[in-house]
């Protein structure tokens, strides 16, 4: 009864109390959506938005030549089908990419000499090949040269204006010097900064500084670029001062009598210089030397006072806001920005000037910094200012007004050279309240003026103005893969543009076609370089599905245009309050990259501007709704946000009077009616890896970090088991990672075998349509991953089962039943055992080796290439000189090892011979050789052999041959096998379509009367007229004649139509498979000089061994120290031994108590399984089994429906369901919303108050002194395997200069004997061993040759010579101009000459190359 108890579904009991409101968004959507937006491949050309690739083309084209007589315009682009599919690219080492074709138009103009008007002379339009562009696979990766790569998203500073100060470090007084910076997406930076004298300076592109007013004046000399809000600004001193300062009007009433206009806004905080009286009542409102308070100002306004009397002293030192001119003579009496002195004031009074304006500067709230800057700056006109800027940017260039203005305009106001991007414009609009449209991406006059105003306000200490926090996520944005590629494409196109311009001017444009102008090489080169060697294009971490998902969700602050490890300080790396729900505070690497590489939180997504958003539920009047919206860090600032676990009743109303909330990064308590938003889920705070750790809330942060990082290093095991104690998101990770096979449509499973699943899909069609309703899923079998782990998919469905779209139908690596399964559930005991678990060592049971519990399969790929060398062609063959038959026993006639052969180090995988010849052969010799065959002495054995440390089984071999080269037997056999596989798929597909079509025909014909006789090809009657068609009669007629059965009405036409449609579908299927088979038969594209390439894959089974690293999910890692027989391990009262013994001292100091809680809950879950197993074995009645099962499934989502199902199950099906639980009841305890102690006790059942067990010593049978914590923990085997690290060398390659052995396993190097090791040997007095280490075993060339000979002859003498490193030292000293000479004693000379006589050559010269093997 496959329909009820389905195999591909796991039921988990969830302990979470908080209902799931929003689904977790697709985990790799950040990659896929970004790249889709970049390519816009599925959007018709005319509907594409100007972003991504389209945007780049639009911004670079049209390209005009230097004389503007012709232009090359962009029309549209489209992508063609990729040449190879994903699998073929993997196998052949190709890049998965599609050719891009661009339609361009070349327009040639005629120019009228007199009027300068242009008219079109000629238009040519053409489609041009524009290179290849890598495509993203289904899983968000790229395949470059056959390897999977991921482009990591970059976190960088958002464009816009930023304000900061130097934290008092620049000047000894500790004074804060404020600065501002306008950062564009691309273009020149503008920096404003104050010095310690409060003068404001500007720097352009970090060059020498100028007074800021020079830039402000220069703005007057260029037109405003604002589209919506242009301003009149001509850069005069008066305009600049009035923009930044308020003015006061001073009236001269007579000698020594002055008044100023009463301006309530400016009076606040000022002191009165005399008693101020109410004009009507004459009472004193403000006493002399007292401040104007708010109440006093209100009284003055109520009294309708228009002006205030002031003392002459108050007017002195005021600054004039405008030129004061004598109207009779036209003489300037007081210049703008001039200080008012006693003499000037008297002069004004004498000349009869009644009033003048001064700047309001009170040195408290308004400082004279900008006025002082204007005084410093000696420039008076915009033209001079622009020239001055030119001199600073191009020192040594004589400026002309035209070139200077051009440079200045191009710097900031030309969209080709300067781009704020939409984000930059959005930020400027937001900061300064400007309403400029987002498509205006250059700076405007107002932007620059407002930046200066804000900076001056900061300096003045204006309230509500503060410096920016650059680590706030509103000031950092994500550049995902699409945007990074867009920037690369732009670089390539700009390079190409230069070449096109040159070609347009060099050649006759009339005769050219667009393709003559365009060379796409620069673009392709840039893209290739980006994918091949950019810091952000990384080799995918493919250890297990979680590591893949995490790698695609990673955010890096490093990379081009980002930070560097050395420069990044503590603040950038630290967790910021805006990371909440956006960036995970836990998952980041340990080491130099800590905090610079982060991971997106589970629910986070990136919006169109590149800011990270997180979802919140809306709260209305204290009631939480189910409406969910996403907010970026800036948008959430004003809101009061409740935690996801705030208590609410069934209607969603907060139950308490006070709710714990967050506002602007601080924790506050608020009333329910003040709350605006609420978190969606408790695990929105952490990333995917961290949310897989149960009881994360009980772990110390450092250990949680290790735990989430180590899960990514877990090796996929041979027998996978999902965790008994999970967190409920295991299924989501497995599904989104793309390693499982997921059903594309609803349907019924037709057939299943280990390598493929055939599904007949439910396709709603009309009576006569024949649709392709077959989905064939070819599973991946034993494929090598980037990290040499094994990728293998196995079906989890049976024929006849119904599947829904999105169901998992096959498990991938490290998944079980569609859930992530990185490790194994094992019974652990926390106790010391004979010191074998000292310092985090792990003691484990031999059962793991016997039952392959922690066994993993690793696949190594070996490649053998036959090249065409100068001396002749290399050949892959079985006929190898000087190799016995025993070594060739597993090679086939082509010289390639057979599949299934067991190999060990030194075995031949592919036989290859290379011609060796001292001389090039003459034509005659070549001819004689061709006639009489090769001499064996002319070739040497260069076969591919198994390297040391690898032993396993050959599972696959692939042969690639050049086009036009005869394929060998092995290649033909492989090709035939592939072809047979394709034909099987084709036949299955046609069969299912045929069955479906004839099913429809049968339905139409049943019950109809035959209106005409039907005969077969030989004339035999099949049906006679008048027969009534039923099932039995129809089955006697072969199906190919059904279309010819004559019946009344329009049924016959319908039947014919079905037959026609079926034939059409059949041809389509054949065409598709024909293409695939054609590709198989074609030769392969190989690198130049390569004739044939063979790849051999060897599978290595690695059992758990002493020295392997293991870990739990809470950062509790250790190394296996001993494997104990089961009978020696501590065992429980019922005789079951534990699997692993861990040290209890590893818990308290590490503070990862989560592991203990997991152990208890795992024990409870396991016990449920054991009890059910016992009930089955003891044949309990179906009623008791039903009761037990229903109790087990309490608290599962939809448990009422489950209970009903259990009641309805027939008695014989109950044990089946119970056996599914025999390993234990799977539970989920979500992060920050997990199981409580009382719930765990309830699951454990009665009588286990202490949650500890009595254990017995396996060797003596006696109980241990104290009770021991025993339970089930999920343990992982990490990718640090001792078999891959162990390495030994006897003879191997030596370094060329020092003649010492190379280092490292990859180079087959030796062990380094360092300074401390020498001391240790000296301390033990092991003089001869030490002498041997430092000479004959290392770099004494003569000595080691002698040693070799002595060993061969069987003598045991040691004669050490002079180490080569001594010669290196002498050469080093000589290079420092020290004359060092090595003098030889007569005895030594005699010994050397004797040795030279024996060896037949001079000694002491370094012989051989870096990889010279010292073999005789």
Curated annotation (Swiss-Prot):
GO terms, biological process: DNA-templated transcription
Name of the top EC class for this enzyme: transferase
Entry-linked InterPro entries: DNA-dir_RNA_pol_bsu_ext_1_sf (IPR042107), DNA-dir_RNA_pol_bsu_external_1 (IPR019462), DNA-dir_RNA_pol_su2 (IPR015712), DNA-dir_RNAP_su2_dom (IPR007120), DNA-dir_RNAP_su2_hyb_sf (IPR037033), RNA_pol_bsu_bac (IPR010243), RNA_pol_bsu_CS (IPR007121), RNA_pol_bsu_protrusion (IPR007644)
Keywords in alphabetical order: DNA-directed RNA polymerase, Nucleotidyltransferase, Transcription, Transferase
Annotated region described as Disordered, given as residue ranges: 1388-1416
Recorded GO MF terms: DNA binding; DNA-directed RNA polymerase activity; ribonucleoside binding
Family annotation (Pfam families): RNA_pol_Rpb2_1, RNA_pol_Rpb2_2, RNA_pol_Rpb2_3, RNA_pol_Rpb2_45, RNA_pol_Rpb2_6, RNA_pol_Rpb2_7
One GO cellular component term: DNA-directed RNA polymerase complex
EC number: 2.7.7.6
SUPFAM superfamilies: beta and beta-prime subunits of DNA dependent RNA-polymerase
The organism's place on the tree of life at top rank: Bacteria
Reactions catalysed according to its record: RNA(n) + a ribonucleoside 5'-triphosphate = RNA(n+1) + diphosphate
Biological role: DNA-dependent RNA polymerase catalyzes the transcription of DNA into RNA using the four ribonucleoside triphosphates as substrates.
PANTHER family linked to this entry: DNA-DIRECTED RNA POLYMERASE I SUBUNIT 2 (PTHR20856)
Family label: Belongs to the RNA polymerase beta chain family.
Quaternary data: The RNAP catalytic core consists of 2 alpha, 1 beta, 1 beta' and 1 omega subunit. When a sigma factor is associated with the core the holoenzyme is formed, which can initiate transcription.
Name of the protein in question: DNA-directed RNA polymerase subunit beta
Annotated organism of origin: Anaeromyxobacter sp. (strain Fw109-5)
């Amino acid at each position: 009864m496959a329909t009820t108890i389905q195999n591909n579904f796991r039921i988990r009991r969830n302990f979470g109390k908080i209902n799931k409101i929003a689904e977790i968004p697709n985990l790799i959507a950040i990659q896929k959506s970004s790249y889709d937006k970049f390519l816009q491949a599925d959007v018709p050309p005319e509907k594409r938005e100007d972003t991504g690739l389209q945007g780049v083309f639009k911004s670079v084209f049209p390209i005009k030549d230097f004389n503007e007589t012709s232009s090359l315009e962009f029309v549209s682009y489209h992508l063609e089908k990729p040449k190879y599919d994903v699998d073929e690219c993997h196998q052949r080492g190709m890049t998965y990419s599609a050719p891009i074709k661009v339609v361009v138009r070349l327009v040639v103009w005629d120019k009228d000499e007199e009027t300068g008007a242009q008219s079109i002379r000629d238009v040519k339009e053409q489609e041009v090949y524009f290179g290849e562009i890598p495509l993203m696979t289904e899983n968000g990766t790229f395949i470059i040269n056959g390897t999977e790569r991921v482009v990591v998203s970059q976190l960088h500073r958002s464009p816009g204006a930023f304000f900061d100060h130097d934290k008092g470090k620049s000047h000894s007084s500790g004074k804060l010097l404020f600065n501002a910076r306008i950062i564009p997406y691309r273009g020149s930076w503008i920096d404003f900064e104050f010095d310690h004298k409060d003068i404001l300076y500007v720097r352009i592109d970090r060059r020498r500084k100028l007074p800021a007013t020079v830039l402000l004046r220069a703005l007057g000399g260029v037109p405003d670029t604002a589209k919506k809000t242009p301003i009149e600004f001509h850069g005069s001193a008066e305009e600049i001062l009035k923009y930044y300062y308020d003015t006061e009007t001073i009236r001269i009433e007579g000698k020594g009598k002055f008044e100023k206009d009463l301006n309530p806004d400016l009076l606040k905080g000022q002191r009165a210089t005399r008693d101020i009286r109410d004009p009507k009542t004459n009472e004193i409102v403000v006493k002399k030397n007292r401040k104007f308070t708010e109440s006093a100002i209100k009284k003055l306004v109520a009294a309708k006072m228009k002006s205030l009397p002031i003392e002459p002293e108050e007017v002195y030192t005021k600054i004039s806001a405008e030129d004061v001119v004598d109207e009779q003579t036209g003489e300037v009496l007081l210049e703008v920005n001039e200080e008012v002195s006693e003499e000037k004031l008297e002069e004004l009074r004498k000349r009869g000037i009644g009033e003048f304006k001064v700047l309001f500067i009170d040195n408290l709230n308004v400082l004279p910094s900008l006025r002082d800057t204007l005084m410093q700056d000696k420039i008076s006109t915009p033209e001079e200012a622009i020239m001055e800027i030119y001199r600073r940017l191009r020192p040594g260039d004589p400026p002309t007004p035209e070139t200077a203005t051009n440079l200045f305009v191009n710097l900031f106001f030309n969209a080709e050279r300067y781009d704020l991007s939409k984000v930059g414009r959005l930020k400027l609009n937001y900061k300064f309240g400007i309403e400029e449209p987002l498509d205006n991406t250059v700076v405007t006059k107002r932007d620059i003026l407002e930046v200066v105003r804000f900076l001056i306000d900061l300096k003045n200490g204006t309230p509500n103005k503060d410096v920016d926090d650059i680590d706030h996520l509103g000031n950092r944005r994500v550049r995902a893969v699409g945007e990074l590629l867009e920037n690369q494409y732009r670089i390539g196109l700009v390079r190409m543009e230069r070449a096109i311009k040159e070609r347009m001017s060099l050649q006759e444009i009339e005769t050219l076609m667009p393709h003559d102008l365009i060379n796409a090489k620069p673009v392709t080169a840039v893209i290739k370089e980006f994918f091949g060697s950019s810091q952000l294009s990384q080799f995918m971490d493919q250890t297990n599905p979680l590591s893949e998902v995490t790698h695609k969700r990673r955010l890096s602050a490093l990379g081009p245009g980002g930070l560097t490890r050395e420069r990044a300080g503590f603040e950038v790396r630290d967790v910021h309050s805006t990371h909440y729900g956006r960036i995970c505070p836990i998952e980041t690497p340990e080491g130099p990259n800590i905090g610079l590489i982060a991971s997106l939180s589970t629910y986070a997504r990136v919006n169109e501007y590149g800011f990270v958003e997180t979802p919140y539920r809306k709260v209305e009047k204290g009631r939480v709704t189910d409406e969910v919206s996403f907010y970026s860090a800036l948008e959430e600032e004003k809101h009061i946000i409740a935690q996801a676990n705030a208590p609410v009743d069934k209607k969603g109303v907060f139950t308490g009077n006070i709710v714990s909330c967050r506002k602007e990064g601080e924790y506050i308590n608020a009333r329910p009616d003040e709350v605006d938003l609420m978190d969606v889920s408790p695990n929105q705070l952490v990333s995917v890896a961290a949310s897989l750790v149960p009881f994360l809330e009980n772990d110390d942060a450092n250990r949680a970090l290790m735990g989430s990082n180590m899960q990514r290093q877990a090796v996929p095991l041979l027998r996978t088991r999902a965790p008994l104690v999970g967190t409920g998101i295991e299924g989501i990770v497995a599904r989104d990672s793309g390693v499982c096979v997921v059903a594309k449509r609803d349907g019924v499973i037709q057939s299943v075998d280990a390598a493929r699943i055939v599904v007949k899909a439910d396709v709603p069609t009309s009576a006569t349509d024949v649709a392709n309703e077959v989905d064939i899923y070819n599973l991946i079998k034993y494929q090598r991953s980037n990290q040499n782990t094994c990728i293998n998919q196995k079906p989890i469905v049976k024929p006849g089962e119904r599947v829904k779209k999105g169901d998992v139908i096959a498990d991938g690596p490290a998944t079980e039943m569609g859930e992530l399964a990185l490790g194994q559930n094992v019974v652990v005991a926390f106790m010391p055992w004979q010191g074998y678990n000292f310092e985090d060592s792990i003691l484990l049971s031999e059962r793991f080796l016997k039952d392959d519990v922690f066994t993993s399969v690793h696949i190594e790929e070996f490649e053998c290439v036959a090249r065409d060398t100068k001396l002749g062609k290399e050949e892959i063959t079985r006929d190898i000189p000087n190799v016995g038959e025993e070594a060739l026993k597993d090679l086939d006639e082509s010289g390639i090892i057979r599949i299934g052969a067991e190999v060990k180090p030194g075995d031949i995988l592919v036989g290859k011979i290379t011609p060796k010849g001292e001389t090039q052969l003459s034509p005659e010799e070549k001819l004689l050789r061709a006639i009489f065959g090769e001499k064996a002495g002319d070739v040497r054995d260069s076969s591919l052999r198994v390297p040391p440390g690898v032993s396993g089984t050959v599972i696959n071999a692939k042969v690639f041959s050049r086009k036009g080269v005869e394929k060998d037997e092995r290649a033909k056999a492989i090709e035939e096998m592939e072809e047979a596989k394709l034909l099987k798929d084709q036949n299955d597909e046609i069969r299912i379509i045929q069955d479906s079509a004839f099913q429809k025909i049968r339905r139409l014909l049943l019950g109809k009367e035959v209106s005409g006789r039907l005969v077969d090809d030989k004339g035999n009657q099949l049906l006679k007229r008048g027969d009534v068609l039923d099932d039995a009669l129809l089955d006697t007629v072969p199906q190919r004649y059904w279309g010819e059965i004559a019946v009344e009405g329009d049924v016959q036409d319908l039947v014919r139509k079905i037959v026609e449609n079926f034939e059409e579908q059949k041809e389509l299927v054949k065409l598709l498979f024909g293409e695939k088979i054609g590709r198989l038969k074609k030769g392969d594209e190989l690198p130049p000089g390569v004739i044939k390439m063979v790849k051999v894959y060897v599978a290595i089974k690695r059992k758990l061994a002493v020295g392997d690293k293991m870990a739990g999910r809470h950062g509790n890692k250790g190394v296996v120290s001993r494997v104990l027989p089961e009978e020696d391990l501590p065992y429980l009262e019922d005789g079951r031994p534990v699997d692993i013994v861990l040290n209890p001292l590893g818990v308290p100091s590490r503070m990862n108590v989560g592991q203990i809680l997991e152990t208890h809950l795992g024990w409870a879950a396991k016990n449920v399984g054991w009890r059910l197993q016992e009930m089955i074995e003891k044949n309990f009645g179906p009623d008791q089994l039903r009761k037990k099962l229903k109790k087990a499934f309490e608290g599962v989502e939809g448990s009422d429906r489950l209970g009903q199902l259990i009641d309805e199950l027939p008695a014989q099906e109950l044990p089946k369901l119970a056996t599914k639980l025999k390993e234990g009841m799977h539970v989920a305890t979500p992060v920050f919303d997990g199981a409580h102690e009382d719930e765990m006790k309830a699951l454990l059942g009665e009588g286990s108050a202490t949650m500890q067990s009595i254990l017995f010593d396996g060797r003596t049978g006696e109980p241990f002194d104290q009770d021991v914590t025993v339970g089930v923990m999920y343990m992982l085997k990490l990718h640090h395997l001792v078999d891959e690290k162990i390495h030994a060398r006897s003879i191997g390659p030596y370094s060329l200069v020092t003649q010492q052995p190379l280092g490292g396993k990859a180079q087959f190097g030796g062990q380094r004997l360092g300074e401390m090791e020498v001391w240790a040997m000296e301390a033990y007095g092991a003089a001869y061993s030490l002498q041997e280490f430092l000479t004959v075993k290392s770099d004494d060339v003569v000595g080691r040759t002698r040693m070799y000979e002595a060993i061969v002859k069987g003598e045991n003498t040691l004669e050490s010579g002079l180490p080569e490193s001594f010669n290196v030292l002498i050469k080093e000293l000589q290079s420092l101009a020290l004359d060092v000479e090595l003098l030889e004693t007569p005895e030594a000379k005699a010994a050397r000459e004797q040795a030279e006589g024996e060896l037949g050559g001079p000694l002491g010269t370094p012989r051989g190359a870096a990889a010279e093997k010292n073999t005789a």
